Amino acid sequence: MIDLSTMKQQIETLLNQAIERLKTKGVLKPEVTPVIKITHTTDPQHGDFATNLALTLSKAAGMRPHALAEKIVEALPPSGQITEVEIAGPGFINFFVTEGSYQTVVSSILKAGKDYGRSEMGKGQRVHMEYVSANPTGPLHVGHGRGAAYGACVANLLNAAGFEVHREYYVNDAGRQMGILALSVWVRYLQGYEASIELPKNAYQGEYIIDIAEALKAKYGKQFYHSVESIQAKIPEEIDSNADPEAYLDAWVTAQKDLLGPKDFECVFQAALDSILNDIKNDLEEFGVTYDDWFPESRLVREGLIQEGLDLLTKHGYVYEKNGAQWFRATALGDEKDRVLIRKNGLPTYFAADVAYHLHKFNQGYDQIIDIFGADHHGYIPRIRGFLKGLGKAPEKLHILLVQFAILYRGNEKVSMSTRGGTFVTLRELRHEVGNDAARFFYIMRKPDQHLDFDLELAKSQSNENPVYYIQYAHARICSVFRQLKTTQKNWDRPRGMENLSLLSTNYEKELLATLGRYPEVIKRAAMNYAPHLLAHYLQTLANQFHTYYNAERFLIEDDNLRNARLNLINAVQQIIRNGLTLLGVSAPEEM
């Protein structure tokens, strides 16, 4: 059995043997250690694989790259799978492999089925992934959708490469925004009893807040009702709602807690949290994004993790007191300024929670820890790496991946989003409009750090310009061929087809075979680089090659040997498209 990555390894072995021969002959010094890089050529006229080894070793050898390339080629051992080796340009070495090497990829694919392309590259390595982790203060919007699709795809790719992946969502259930959420629900609840009271302008304004308030009213009646006068009496007169709206909002939250008391406040708070978090969970599950754990921030306090982090930073000399607060000496570890850990009122900051949460991740013994953040969190990178050093943890284990938010266009008009303002397009609305498949694919078809203009009309179109439709249509077309086969007197003899793969000699077939052989390498590269867009682009290429082949050749022909060989080939294409789409969280329909 062969795949492209296996062929690369074989060529690398041949080159290493050639280098050892050149060392024996004195052409290269014994201490020379080559770094061999083998790439797939883009032009078949230049062979199937190429290496720049002669260019990288020319200085150590003391000769021109082309002359060294000649020496390397002369020293190469013979191989039954390589038909020709040529030198191109200043010293590139091109390898041409036998057609039989590519034809055997069909049998490899059909034998492995849904497992083709999977590897044990990451066997024994555990990876912790955190992604989305949007505050449970409202429904997910289209910006969150990109992080969800990207994170889920990266997790799938790492799993396919043999890594054991733990998927986690961090639930911010203990921050200031949650207090504002509880306040927003409570004010809407009071308005439901016709209280003459206005929702503070910086509170959460969406219709979903009213829905939660109505459910609260239906279940608890007037249990949480207080007069407008009693509320206003709790708001300090010196706070101007226009001059300092955030301070005014905080005063409201304090008033709510005082009036309701701990038990009733917790009841309102929990009703809001449960409603929104359940909605987020359902939304993501419908989107095909699932988690192994939903980790609440409140657990950090409950299990003493914040104190554990604080103690460790203190032990290492990175904590000091100023103005009644406890500070992290972040500037000593590369950050632009020191950070408050514990406020003077004794409450931990968001930063302290970040420290505790990452300490918890590292304490679990993962080999890799991946945080996927929105691009607006780029400033977090130096501070996170800084406190990891302060904790005595290895920052190189942490990989922070930034995802640009998707920008949604309806026609030529850009849609703005604001969670507190309530005017935003939700992920659910997007999914219902364009479908899960289009949303999942469009979100990951560009590099995550590139801006994504999400074209609604293109995502809904059934045309060749819509990449996900084009790929799915290739799969459906192949299914159609096999349905047509059942209506004829012809049969499909898979073993006979395997015996006649050498008949696949057209340029279309050679191109498809070469592309099929690249699939395992694409999965490995996409996994190691956290780059699902590489798989998306590969599937577009494969689909395009198949459509060209479909339009040029016939499959249900009279020639039994060629028919069976071609049916095996397109069955392999069908399997790879299905495997690839599955990793991207996209369906492979049999009819369209």
Swiss-Prot record:
Motif ('HIGH' region): 134-144
Superkingdom in the source lineage: Bacteria
GO molecular function terms attached to this record: arginine-tRNA ligase activity; ATP binding
Principal location class: cytoplasm
InterPro entries to which the protein is assigned, alphabetical: aa-tRNA-synth_I_CS (IPR001412), Arg-tRNA-ligase (IPR001278), Arg-tRNA-synth_N (IPR005148), Arg-tRNA-synth_N_sf (IPR036695), ArgRS_core (IPR035684), DALR_anticod-bd (IPR008909), Rossmann-like_a/b/a_fold (IPR014729), tRNAsynth_Ia_anticodon-bd (IPR009080)
Subcellular location: Cytoplasm
EC number: 6.1.1.19
Nucleotide-binding in keyword set: yes
Keyword vocabulary terms for this entry: Aminoacyl-tRNA synthetase, ATP-binding, Cytoplasm, Ligase, Nucleotide-binding, Protein biosynthesis
GO biological process, one term: arginyl-tRNA aminoacylation
Record SMART domains: Arg_tRNA_synt_N, DALR_1
Pfam hit, one: DALR_1
PROSITE patterns for this protein: AA_TRNA_LIGASE_I
Family recorded in the similarity comment: Belongs to the class-I aminoacyl-tRNA synthetase family.
Record HAMAP family: Arg_tRNA_synth
Subunit comment: Monomer.
Protein name: Arginine--tRNA ligase
Lineage: Bacteria, Pseudomonadati, Pseudomonadota, Gammaproteobacteria, Legionellales
Gene that specifies this protein: argS
